[in-house]
């Protein structure tokens, strides 16, 4: 091939070649070209054996992570509350309302909505929406009416214990009326519902419509003294209205208290007896716990709904807006969450929150006596923001 190239180069340089030499060179080039084509045609790719359908190609297995290294599954979302009946079996009252120490923890649900206030008044529809969301999260049940039916039978006489001792920071009527609405939706007659606090005057000043014996929801103060509660510090009498009730929904509002540290669900029942002043010694401890342990309170209480749309961290007539409802079956756990909210607001105002914590010593006594949980490790806190 080198000689051929040399000869071609010579031809390009103008050196003549003979006819015989030209024919020889041409035949050699043709032979080389044919040899290349033959090599191309015969060099077919090696055949590939397709995989057998019943025997797929094996692969090296990927090692599974150890269980300890697996991330914890996310918490399931709260069910979407609905008023449509559920095909599932309705919850039973004992299983629904159980809390610590009968269960491992006590659940408290905090539902917030930044738009709940319209000027100086709460929006009733938003409050009702907050209540539904809280009941659904508390019970892990989307069918909120099934929960209310479990909490009250048609023949029950349900007392809603509100707190109206201060016109500046009472239980907001919109919260009590939302509870009334759902009790009626669940089948309870309006006449079997009583919105109650110790005096007519305090109820009226807080914005409630009084009704004593007329058609519709009842609303009035105490109507006479009834059964005795013999406590360590003093003997007091429940008002007859507590004796007559077969079920209680406790609807307090969180506020500071000079003799108890805080007043939320437990302290609210000082308005259920005739001589509350006799129970204020030693930071209301253990009187406040013993009172709530009485069958007239403990056995009848179905639910606690903390009206924390506004709270009173220092001055009852200077409330702070929290835009929240606190909902639980455990009054001690709810009071603990309410106390922490009061602490936050007082500190935000530059105040010392020590008395709120040290003064609420009855919470520890309540846990020791099995009334509910105040230890943070025993409280299952669920917080929901709707808007």
Description of each model-found segment:
Residues 162-164, 182-185:
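N-terminal entry module detector
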């Amino acid at each position: 091939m080198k000689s051929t190239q040399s000869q071609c180069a010579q031809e390009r340089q103008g050196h003549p070649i003979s006819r015989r030499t030209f024919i020889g060179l041409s035949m050699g080039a043709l032979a080389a070209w044919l040899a290349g084509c033959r090599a191309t045609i015969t060099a077919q790719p090696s055949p590939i054996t397709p995989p057998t359908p019943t025997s797929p190609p094996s692969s090296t297995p990927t090692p599974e992570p150890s269980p300890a290294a697996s991330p914890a599954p996310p918490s399931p979302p709260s069910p979407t509350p609905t008023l449509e009946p559920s095909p599932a079996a309705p919850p039973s009252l004992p299983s629904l309302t159980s809390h610590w120490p009968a269960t491992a923890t006590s659940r408290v649900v905090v539902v917030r909505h930044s738009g709940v206030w319209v000027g100086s008044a709460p929006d009733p529809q938003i409050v009702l929406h907050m209540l539904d969301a809280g009941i659904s999260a508390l019970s892990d049940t989307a069918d909120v009416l099934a929960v209310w039916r479990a909490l009250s039978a048609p023949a029950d006489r349900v007392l809603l214990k509100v707190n109206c001792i201060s016109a500046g920071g009472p239980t907001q009527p919109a919260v009590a009326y939302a509870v009334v609405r759902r009790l009626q939706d669940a089948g309870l007659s309006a006449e079997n519902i009583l919105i109650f606090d110790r005096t007519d005057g305090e109820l009226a000043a807080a914005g409630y419509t009084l009704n004593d014996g007329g058609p519709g929801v009842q609303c009035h103060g105490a109507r006479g003294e009834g059964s005795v509660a013999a406590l360590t510090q003093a003997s007091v009498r429940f008002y007859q209205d507590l004796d007559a009730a077969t079920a209680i929904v406790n609807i307090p509002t969180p506020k500071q208290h000079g003799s108890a540290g805080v007043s939320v669900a437990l302290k609210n029942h000082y308005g259920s007896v005739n001589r509350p002043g006799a129970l204020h010694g030693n930071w209301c401890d253990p009187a406040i716990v013993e009172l709530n342990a009485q069958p007239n309170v403990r056995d009848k209480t179905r639910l606690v709904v903390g009206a924390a749309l506004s709270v009173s961290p220092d001055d009852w007539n200077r409330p702070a807006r929290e835009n929240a409802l606190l909902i639980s079956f455990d009054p001690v756990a709810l009071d603990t969450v309410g106390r922490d909210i009061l602490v936050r607001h007082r500190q935000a105002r530059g105040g010392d929150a020590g008395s709120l914590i040290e003064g609420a010593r009855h919470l520890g006594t309540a846990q020791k006596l099995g009334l509910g949980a105040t230890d943070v490790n025993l409280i299952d806190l669920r917080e929901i923001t709707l808007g």
